[in-house]
Amino acid sequence: MLPAMKTVEAEEEYAEDCPELVPIETKHQEKEENLDFIIKIPVTIVTGYLGAGKTTLLNYILTEQHNRKIAVILNEFGEGSAVEKSLAVSQGGELYEEWLELRNGCLCCSVKDNGLKAIENLMQKKGKFDYILLETTGLADPGAVASMFWVDAELGSDIYLDGIITVVDSKYGLKHLTEEKPDGLVNEATRQVALADMILINKTDLVSEEELNKLRTTIRSINGLGKVLETQRSRTHLSNILDLHAYDTLSGISLQKKLQHVSTAPHLDQSIVTVTFDVPGSAEEESLNVFIQNLLWEKNVKNKDGRCMEVIRLKGLVSIKDKPQQMIVQGIHELYELEESRVNWKDDAERACQLVFIGKNLDKDILQQLFITAVAETKEQTTAPGQDGACPPH
């Protein structure tokens, strides 16, 4: 129970304190060992700007009775150069805890490999968990952290990335999202929203409806693909948070329905926008790979102002020549994959390529024309409009 608080701010400060991990009751804690090692464990990344309510969300999840064994990775800041990170799990009424010392506040940098190995070792030593929640620092890039798990899944790991949740503070979110960095780079809060599969607009009771509408519009213009929920004190139904399956090979039908609701964002003042287009017909697989690699790897595609386009997130449903299945493409930063769905195209007349890009300096017209020019079945890959030399590294 919360102690008596004199102000809303005091209550929020208490809620943001590091949560005390509580035992999670499980009905079936004794499972067969072999089955335990077959099931892959989902990892949900919880990110958001400092003070948005990430820790409050974790505390809420940990105190709910959902019959799961949950491992929690908490990000704690220290005054010195080293940061301690706690790996803990509530299991059978006992709290197991190990410490992994970090030299900076970002899991994806100097401890990229060790961080993942620590999770796997913890799982082997203490037994399997039903779920892992990873809280990133307020200044971390969740895309790099997500890539770590995505790559490891390809290597046969027994954990997989389930989704990214970004918590946004209603009161200060607009300020954070529109803040301009002197070096011209994308600010951390905007990047976190751009990469989210689920966006929680938190503390909605502290702002007016007008302020909330401005924040909604800004968030949707940055990320037209993620789901948006509004919360107070980071509380929402657990089904909205756990088991998102955002990176699974979705059926073509479900992805097609989702893409139909995504539209190109109006050009406001945001540095990151969502762009989408639909091109009828099929694509050559090799040409499609070159098109994506030029965007994600070579970064040599420019907009009308001569600025390099930076794709942070990519998702789409495409038709590949000579393949009966609908193909799903998705990517984060420099990683992408093209996989078969479980749905076949009914006939050639319905074949099409639907793509959604989230990123910086994006130009829909140039992207669409480049796609048509470079990926058409009868075309060879050539230098297309907007592709006239490598961009400088970011």
UniProtKB/Swiss-Prot annotation:
Residues 272-375 form the CobW C-terminal domain. A motif (psi-PxLVp motif) lies at residues 16-23. Keywords: Chaperone, GTP-binding, Hydrolase, Metal-binding, Nucleotide-binding, Nucleus, Zinc. Zn(2+) binds at residues 106, 108-109. GO terms for cellular component: cytoplasm; nucleus. GTP binds at residues 48-55, 109-113, 202-205. This is Zinc-regulated GTPase metalloprotein activator 1. It comes from Rattus norvegicus.
